[in-house]
Each structure stands twice: as structure tokens, then as C-alpha cells.
A protein has these predicted regions:
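Structural motif
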Residues: 54, 80, 204-206
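Acidic-enriched, low-complexity/disordered segments with a strong bias for Aspartate over Glutamate
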Residues: 9, 19, 25, 30-34, ...
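Phosphate/Mg2+-binding loops and adjacent switch elements
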Residues: 1-77, 84-89
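Alpha-helix N-cap/loop-to-helix initiation residues
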Residues: 57-58, 82, 132, 209
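P-loop NTP-binding site
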Residues: 95-251
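Class I S-adenosyl-L-methionine
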Residues: 56-57, 78, 83, 87-98, ...
Length: 251
């Protein structure tokens, strides 16, 4: 909390996070129209847009095509890796001058539902006990790469893929937002080999949930060692059901 601030000063400002490379891709004229529609609506409903991975773009310009992300919005560059901009972002959403909920959206809920129905959301957790002890990095890296390969071969576009491994010797997380993209890796990369690994996989992809699940299950069976405690769900988001429509404020 900022010096001199009290609990009564705190407010909540809706914010959206935007991956710069993924955002630039969705803003191209040849991008998938449904995915671009969802992206634009998510930006529009936010009072503050947070552009992530600032550490990859020292000049804060981002990849080509990024500029429209912040058009019409308050925007901040953030880096979860270095902490750049995080304190300023927290101060802004809690104590800043931006009016919370100041935007009224005109949403085509039928199109929104169609766009979300094109996505498969997969959540997977399991325990891996390899035949020989191995480090978390050597579990996460090959598994994420293998998932990328089989999803690409199945012509399933990745929107977001994250693999997290927790072991007694340390943890590692790797994630990316497109097929073939270099993953962002965090954690204890030099952790010692471990005999037991608890893994989480979060996947958002464009495709039929049953097909996405089949592909991921197939790769799960390829892991060497004993796999147990599998919890897997894969589904398309249900259609939004707004409780009420708020009339647009008079100018």
C-alpha cells in the first residue's frame, strides 16, 4: 500500500493482460476473426491494459503491429520476470485516477458464444515417477516440446500452453502462446534430479475438445515411468449469460 494511503482509498479497476506477440498476431488483418473478436472485447472491457513481457522489448515498442493494442486504453508495460512496472500498475488499479467501470460495452453475445465455443480448455494434473530420477527441467522441457509437436501435427492451433512441475528438489514452469514459439521458462533450472514429479498442464487451443483431449492423452502415455493420480478435463466454455443489460450512459 502506498505511503499515507488507507483502506478507504482502495478501489478496484478492471485490467486486462495482453501478450505482445499474441496481440500483434490477433490484430493482423488475416488473423482468425473469432479469436480477434474475443481479444478486442477483452481489451475493451478493461479500464487498464497491461502489456506483458516488457523485458523482451527494452524500447517498449513491442513487435510490429502491437501499437493498436493500447489504442483508446490506458496501458502499462509489465514484466513478471524483472518486476518492471508492477508496483506502478498496483498503485494505478488501487489508488490511481482511472475511473473503475467507466466503459459500457455493446456485446454481440451470440457471436461471443460462437467464438468461445471454438476453443478447447484443457486442465490436466498428474504424478510422474520416472524409471530414473530426473530434474524438473528435463521433465518440463521435453514434455512441452512433445505436446507442441503433436498438437501441430494434428493441426490444432495453440492459444496458450503451460506446463508446471513441482518436485522435492525444486520447480520449473514453461509456457508459450503459439505453435512452435520459444517457451518462457522460470524456476529452479539447476534443481537436482527427483524421483517424484507433480505436474500441471493448462492448454487453451482452437479445436474440438474431444480431439484435443485425445492428442494430449496420447502424449501422456508416451511418458517413461509410472503415471498416476491423473485428473483431466477438456471442454468448451459455456455461452455467457448476462444477468442484466446496462443501458449506455447518456453523453
Amino acid at each position: 500500500m502506498s505511503e499515507g494511503a488507507t483502506m478507504s482509498d482502495i478501489k478496484a479497476v478492471p485490467a486486462a493482460g495482453a501478450d505482445p506477440a499474441r496481440g500483434a498476431e490477433l490484430l493482423r488483418e488475416d488473423s482468425d476473426s473469432d479469436m480477434a473478436f474475443l481479444f478486442q472485447k477483452q481489451l475493451q472491457e478493461a479500464d487498464l491494459v497491461c502489456v506483458t513481457k516488457a523485458d523482451l522489448y527494452p524500447e517498449a515498442d513491442g513487435p510490429p503491429g502491437l501499437t493498436p493494442i493500447s489504442s483508446g486504453h490506458a496501458a502499462r508495460w509489465l514484466s513478471a520476470k524483472t518486476g518492471q512496472g508492477v508496483q506502478e500498475w498496483l498503485d494505478e488499479i488501487l489508488f490511481g485516477a482511472i475511473e473503475a467501470g467507466g466503459t459500457t460495452l455493446d456485446i454481440d453475445y451470440a457471436r461471443y458464444a460462437r467464438a468461445e465455443a471454438a476453443l478447447a480448455w484443457l486442465n490436466l494434473s498428474f504424478v510422474l515417477e520416472p524409471a530414473l530420477a530426473v530434474s524438473p527441467a528435463l521433465v518440463v522441457g521435453p514434455f512441452l516440446d512433445a505436446l507442441d509437436v503433436v498438437l501441430t501435427e494434428a493441426e490444432i492451433p495453440i492459444v496458450h500452453l503451460k506446463v508446471f512441475d513441482n518436485s522435492a528438489c525444486g520447480w520449473v514452469k514453461a509456457a508459450h502462446c503459439a505453435n512452435g514459439e520459444e517457451p518462457r521458462v522460470e524456476g529452479d533450472l539447476d534443481a537436482s534430479p527427483a524421483e517424484r514429479h507433480e505436474l500441471l498442464v493448462n492448454l487453451r487451443a482452437r479445436g474440438d475438445p474431444a480431439n484435443v483431449q485425445r492428442v494430449v492423452e496420447g502424449q501422456l502415455r508416451q511418458l517413461g515411468g509410472r503415471v498416476s493420480d491423473i485428473r483431466l478435463e477438456c471442454f468448451s466454455p459455456s455461452a455467457p449469460k448476462p444477468e442484466r443489460r446496462v443501458p449506455r450512459a447518456a453523453a
